[in-house]
């Protein structure tokens, strides 16, 4: 099943903590979470799907330097 995943790792290592994790399951839902000390935290699932299969979209991520 096609999906789009965005992870903001806290270090340049694959197994580092993830400050923000988002995975879009096109046509279904969006999942958001974070990983702290190797443990996934409370998962938030959004069923209001803003994306549609086959339709283009723009993804813009803005992270202020004093917030991450």
Swiss-Prot record:
UniProt record, GO biological process: regulation of activated T cell proliferation; regulation of T cell anergy; regulation of T cell cytokine production; T cell apoptotic process
Galectin domain ranges (all copies): 1-68
Record-linked PROSITE patterns: GALECTIN
Primary subcellular site in the record, as a coarse category: cytoplasm
SUPFAM superfamilies: Concanavalin A-like lectins/glucanases
Lineage summary: Eukaryota, Metazoa, Chordata, Craniata, Vertebrata
Species whose genome carries this gene: Mus musculus (Mouse)
Subcellular location: Cytoplasm, Cytosol; Cytoplasmic granule
Gene it is expressed from: Clc
Subunit structure, as described in the record: Interacts with CEL.
UniProt name for this protein: Galectin-10
């Amino acid at each position: 099943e096609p999906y789009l995943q965005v992870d903001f790792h806290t270090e340049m290592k694959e197994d580092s903590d993830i400050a923000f994790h988002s995975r879009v399951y096109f046509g279904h839902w969006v999942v958001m979470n974070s990983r702290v000390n190797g443990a996934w935290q409370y998962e938030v699932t959004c069923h209001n799907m803003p994306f549609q299969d086959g339709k283009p979209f723009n993804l813009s991520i803005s992270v202020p330097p004093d917030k991450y």
